[in-house]
Amino acid sequence: MVSFFMEHALTMILIILIINVVYVTLFTVRMIFTLKNQRYLAATVSMIEIIVYVLGLSLVLDNLDRIENLIAYAVGYGIGVITGMKVEEKLALGYITVNVITKEYEPDIPNTLRDKGYGVTNWVAYGREGERLMMEILTSRKSEADLYATIKKLDPKAFIISHEPKTFFGGFWVKGIRR
């Protein structure tokens, strides 16, 4: 008899844990879609998300006398945050603008990047120790790691900083982007 209750309790803990991992992952994905202005995808995910949320929460609230259920809920939430972040990295929606300042003035770097398909705007900049090459590069987030690796290969001491543009009009990218 004790073994039945132990198995049942363990099953409940696993269900609560899994439900909360799924819930928080869906929450993260919905937020990404919302921030990327993909309202219909965000709305669809939110409907699934709320069903999963209510199921998980009701399992915990119906069994508040079992502290292990609450702990499973909290642990599932934490794992869900990590899982959601991994999903966000894989989705890599949107674009980034990368600003690069080279250690030395190397005029061939922009053309090397252009040959790889990147849109590059460049100019001469002046730092404390003389002329530098300044570049502004717009790329998809899926290409971000490759771009960084290419830049580091071309100039291991380059200063690189990036940010996500909210909107952009005209230029190199507009021809190839479908919205």
Swiss-Prot record:
It is a multi-pass membrane protein. The chain crosses the membrane at residues 9-29, 41-61, 67-87. InterPro entries: DUF2179, DUF5698, UPF0316. It comes from the Bacteria. GO terms for cellular component: plasma membrane. Its main location: membrane. Keywords: Cell membrane, Membrane, Transmembrane, Transmembrane helix. The keyword Transmembrane helix applies. It is found in: Cell membrane. Belongs to the UPF0316 family. This is UPF0316 protein BH0621. It comes from Halalkalibacterium halodurans (strain ATCC BAA-125 / DSM 18197 / FERM 7344 / JCM 9153 / C-125).
